């Protein structure tokens, strides 16, 4: 599973390095070096203010997601909402394989939507990973502090 937070950089051409631990997870846990990068769901930071990163989906996880979106039933989304999800998540997605040095190219349309400039983070989220600009990550973490389910029985049951 993807765990941890890794600070790195992205150059002006969109080249960055997938953390070695994440490359290992792709192959050892998910059995494939291929992955997809796409937009994440927007995170609401306030009235009319949203932040967004990118998501790295292992190949098999992405195919399973596509299948669910293709069928569309049982998701609890209207046809307009489902179309919006497909436009935001599926349309911009790119299939990737890191080179022998772990480098990957993030295309301009994804860099722009996630406001990726120089300092970026790869964040493990168990079955997927996220890519954030340092500034956007800090905003989302502040929001997470407000949204954290303090005294949640569910968290207590999990041992957290």
Swiss-Prot record:
Residues 5-50, 93-136 form the SpoVT-AbrB domain. Keywords: Cytoplasm, DNA-binding, Repeat, Transcription, Transcription regulation. GO terms for biological process: negative regulation of DNA-templated transcription initiation. GO terms for cellular component: cytoplasm; nucleoid. GO terms for molecular function: DNA-binding transcription factor activity; transcription cis-regulatory region binding. The keyword Cell cycle does not apply. CDD domains: MraZ_C, MraZ_N. It is found in: Cytoplasm, Nucleoid. Its main location: cytoplasm. InterPro entries: MraZ, MraZ_C, MraZ_dom, MraZ_N, MraZ_sf, SpoVT-AbrB_dom, SpoVT-AbrB_sf. Gene3D superfamilies: Transcriptional regulator MraZ domain. Forms oligomers. NCBIfam families: PRK00326.3-4. Belongs to the MraZ family. This is Transcriptional regulator MraZ. It comes from Geotalea uraniireducens (strain Rf4). The gene is mraZ.
């Amino acid at each position: 599973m993807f765990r941890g937070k890794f600070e790195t950089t992205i150059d002006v051409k969109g080249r960055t390095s997938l953390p070695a631990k994440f490359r290992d997870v792709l192959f050892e846990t998910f059995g494939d070096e291929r992955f997809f990068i796409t937009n994440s769901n927007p995170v609401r930071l306030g009235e009319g203010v949203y932040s967004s990163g990118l998501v790295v989906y292992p190949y098999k996880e992405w195919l399973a997601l596509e299948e669910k979106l293709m069928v569309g039933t049982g998701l609890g989304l209207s046809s307009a909402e489902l179309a919006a999800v497909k436009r935001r998540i599926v349309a911009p997605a790119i299939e990737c394989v890191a080179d022998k040095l772990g480098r990957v190219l993030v295309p301009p349309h994804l860099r722009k939507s996630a406001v990726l400039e120089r300092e970026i983070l790869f964040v493990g989220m168990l079955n997927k990973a996220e890519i954030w600009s340092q500034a956007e990550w800090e905003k989302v973490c502040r929001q997470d502090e407000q949204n954290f389910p303090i005294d949640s029985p569910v968290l207590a049951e999990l041992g957290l």
